[in-house]
Amino acid sequence: MKIYLVGGAVRDALLGLPVKDKDWVVVGATPQEMLDAGYQQVGRDFPVFLHPQTREEYALARTERKSGSGYTGFTCYAAPDVTLEEDLQRRDLTINALAQDDDGHIVDPYQGRRDLDNRLLRHVSPAFSEDPLRVLRVARFAARYAHLSFRIADETLALMRDMTAAGELEHLTPERVWKETENALTTRNPQVFFQVLRDCGALRVLFPEVDALFGVPAPAKWHPEIDTGIHTLMTLSMAAMLSPNVDVRFATLCHDLGKGLTPKALWPRHHGHGPAGVKLVEQLCQRLRVPNEIRDLAKLVAEFHDLIHTFPILQPKTIVKLFDSIDAWRKPQRVEQIALTSEADVRGRTGFEASDYPQGRWLREAWLVAQAVPTKEVVEAGFKGAEIREELTRRRIAAVANWKERRCPKPEA
């Protein structure tokens, strides 16, 4: 029996990055030998065991053979005669097909170290095309390592295009698509994930609402980048700089979906694109089974982001109504989330990346003022039932009006 550290732990250590999770491959062992050694079996489809002390995963070396459609259509063979090289060959990318033995020696049968040095994401074998989930995984790795200047090998991108054209992505479940997307949204450069999907044709299949934005122009005065798809990815990039929050990043991705519905005759203007985009956000989230909290924020951002931009001319009544509409009284975090997405929208434009966004500060300040109006005083004043809400709203409007007069500059005539 020989045990090897494999995959991401070896890859990240060679890149000088922190190693989070460790996975191990066991060569030359049987399931019974693992059980006798105190390991706990957890794998149903193939033998995976948990170490009795560390609880890290140890998998018996195995091969995989395509036996059906999609990413689940595989037959696994795990036995003592499966070699380490055979196990590594089934992996997606050469940089993930690395192993390390007890002495620290790196086993590299598929030139993974060379590709690490060359910052290249390259598939191990033609079997890559048997698993459509790998299209999303490669896009996610491209986003994860974009800051290290990794790129996808031409032949790998060509294979991803072929897989997409062959309809392989249609076998992916919504849950797996969302999980990969969610993981990609946590990376330093989530916009790269969606750009790669577009490069291989997968964006049109999995995110048609986002893909439809490319080629849709916006007024050059406000959007020097002109193309709404490009603006969307720039905005997502900016959101990633402003917040680690997946909710904020996903909402930013969806903020301009309504522009994809504007008739060409009306281009480059997109009047009413915010409310129009809400249905598309709902459609996308329902299809991918996006968690409700993330979906709800994305819908609110689509509807109200342009309103935030006009903050200096908003009436106090409108500001308080906005807080009502986003349910800020029960979910105050939404004020900060919407301020950040609106800022990302403004700064996600060519030449505006370093722009100040005072509207975000004013929104936060107005919220603190409105929130500070005590409900207790309204009740103690004798108001009852529906009157309480009406009076509380009136006082909030008055407080915001007083603050706005002092703190928020009046727009130029």
Curated annotation (Swiss-Prot):
Pfam families: HD, PolyA_pol, PolyA_pol_RNAbd. Magnesium is required for nucleotidyltransferase activity. Nickel for phosphatase activity. Residues 228-329 form the HD domain. Disulfide bonds: none annotated. The gene is cca. The lineage of its organism: Bacteria, Pseudomonadati, Pseudomonadota, Gammaproteobacteria, Enterobacterales. This is Multifunctional CCA protein. ATP binds at residues 8, 11, 91, 137, 140. Comprises two domains: an N-terminal domain containing the nucleotidyltransferase activity and a C-terminal HD domain associated with both phosphodiesterase and phosphatase activities.
